[in-house]
């Protein structure tokens, strides 16, 4: 199984999509087709945490002043399901491994995994 979740208007996502070999991937644009509860649960099982999947750089995170709040795992889950920008991106699932975000180390690990 190879899946990728990205935001089409995100320049970083587009750069990474061009950088890695996405042949054979099922790609999902999260603004036009937001992740559902089942997909998020699959990501959670692989990552071990909703917080790891949560984008703390989202504008809404700042405007809602979420940094000052003590957010539970259940709340992180709900925020991601309600607002696509709260999903850290891109997210790639390759077999039973998950690659979250755009750090160089994550992108390099993804490239090594898919060859």
Model segments located where?
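Local sequence-structure signature of Cys/Sec-based thiol-disulfide redox active-site neighborhoods
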Residues: 1-30
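Thiol/selenol-based redox catalytic cores and closely related redox-interacting motifs
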Residues: 33-110, 114-115
């Amino acid at each position: 199984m190879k899946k990728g979740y990205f935001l089409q208007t995100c320049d970083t996502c587009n750069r990474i999509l061009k950088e890695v070999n996405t042949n054979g991937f099922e790609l999902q644009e999260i603004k036009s087709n937001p992740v559902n509860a089942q997909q998020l649960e699959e990501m959670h099982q692989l990552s071990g945490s909703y917080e790891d999947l949560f984008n703390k750089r989202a504008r809404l995170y700042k405007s809602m002043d979420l940094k000052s709040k003590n957010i539970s795992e259940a709340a992180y889950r709900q925020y991601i399901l309600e607002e696509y920008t709260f999903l850290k991106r891109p997210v790639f699932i390759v077999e039973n491994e998950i690659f979250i975000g755009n750090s160089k180390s994550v992108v390099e690990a993804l490239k090594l995994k898919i060859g």
